[in-house]
Swiss-Prot record:
Gene3D superfamilies: 1.20.1050.10, Glutaredoxin. It comes from Drosophila melanogaster (Fruit fly). Disulfide bonds: none annotated. Belongs to the GST superfamily. Delta family. Residues 90-210 form the GST C-terminal domain. The lineage of its organism: Eukaryota, Metazoa, Ecdysozoa, Arthropoda, Hexapoda. This is Glutathione S-transferase D7. PANTHER family: GLUTATHIONE S TRANSFERASE D10, ISOFORM A-RELATED (PTHR43969:SF9). Residues 2-83 form the GST N-terminal domain. Conjugation of reduced glutathione to a wide number of exogenous and endogenous hydrophobic electrophiles. May be involved in detoxification. One of its GO terms (biological process) is glutathione metabolic process. Glutathione binds at H53, T54, I55, E67, S68, R69. Pfam families: GST_C (PF00043), GST_N (PF02798).
């Protein structure tokens, strides 16, 4: 069994994505907590591992890689079965998966960061323009899922797992997914087809409580 250390904040979408990919591959991860809310990522011992001080960061027997989508692909390529459906060898299938991963990073996750995740730093959501970009991103995803059960072809791939980690995060907030019926259907199907989904839900609940506690603390500060 490989020695895989994952430096992560378990409730964060990117960390949850890697937890699920590892589960799909039957891999055990040594989870190393990096609490970014307390600045753990800036400690010298972590910066020596990852000078960009981002999470998640994977250390595989001395080999270091960060950026969750790169980690996901690396794990499947190294530890998955030959021509794994999670990331097939076929260039066109792989290209579509890559496109969806880049869509998540540059469009969907980016939109959520600038609207929803702003609350962790400012105590407030983003402005209307930021919300419009969230709706636009979900609209694209809804189109990708038209007439199919997965985001990049006819089977579950790393693109589904990574994007499910992103999309499921809206459960922390009051966001109506019914406007995007294909996305809603896909998310509801996730427990049936996604390895590690129970762990994802546990981490989601921890994140929701963390957010509630954070909001309560900020409200108390305002009243004081």
């Amino acid at each position: 069994m490989p020695n895989l250390d994952l430096y992560n904040f378990p409730m964060a979408p990117a960390s949850r994505a890697i937890q699920m990919v590892a589960k799909a591959l039957g891999l055990e991860l040594n989870s190393k907590l990096i609490n970014t809310m307390e600045g753990d990522q800036l400690k010298p011992e972590f910066v020596r591992i990852n000078p960009q001080h981002t999470i998640p960061t994977l250390v595989d027997n001395g080999f270091v890689i960060w950026e969750s989508r790169a980690i996901a692909v690396y794990l499947v390529e190294k530890y998955g079965k030959p021509d794994s459906p999670l990331y097939p060898n076929d260039p066109q299938k792989r290209a579509l998966i890559n496109q969806r991963l880049y869509f998540d990073m540059g469009t969907l996750y980016d939109a959520l960061t600038k609207y929803f995740f702003l609350i962790f730093r400012t105590g407030k959501f983003g402005d209307q323009e930021a919300l419009d970009k969230v709706n636009s991103a979900f609209g694209f995803l809804n189109t990708f899922l038209e007439g199919q059960d997965f985001v990049a072809g006819s089977q579950l791939t790393v693109a589904d797992i990574v994007i499910l980690a992103t999309v499921s995060t809206v459960e922390w907030f009051s966001f109506d997914l019914s406007k995007f019926p294909n996305v809603e259907r896909w998310l509801k199907n996730a427990p049936k087809v996604t390895p590690g989904w129970e762990q994802n839900l546990e981490s989601l609940q921890q994140g929701k409580k963390f957010l509630q506690d954070l909001q309560a603390a900020k409200e108390k500060e305002v009243k004081a």
